[in-house]
């Protein structure tokens, strides 16, 4: 009888530990799916900008699944000569590491260089992604684009639900 009681206690402790592991895996699985989707949204913006010649200043329009038409500005400036801070050209501020500075408020990013893109999923679920970019004119024939995206709810660094922002960079020319 005593052995059965001890076995049941050990089993209960083991199942309790397994339930916490299960919850952590559910959180990280959802986080991974949002991380993949934010990379795809950033890639979409990158492809749209890269499709134009480097010296083009033509604005593009992208429509999300909520029907919002977002303007994508393709005008860049030389490094430290535009709105992107000391390390960027035009657009969202860049850090010294050359990535989008997520400490900058969304409203502080110049119009045409940020959007809150809505992605629709199964069952009417929607996820909003904060997408920002910076364009650095390297010469009259070359431009560097840095695009970053993350879910809007990922405002805190660390934790199980934190999604590392995707940062994509390319150099396009004529």
Predicted regions located by residue number:
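Aliphatic-rich helix starts adjacent to a transmembrane/signal segment
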Residues: 2-43
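Low-complexity, Gly/Pro-rich coil/beta segments used as flexible assembly/activation regions
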Residues: 40-174
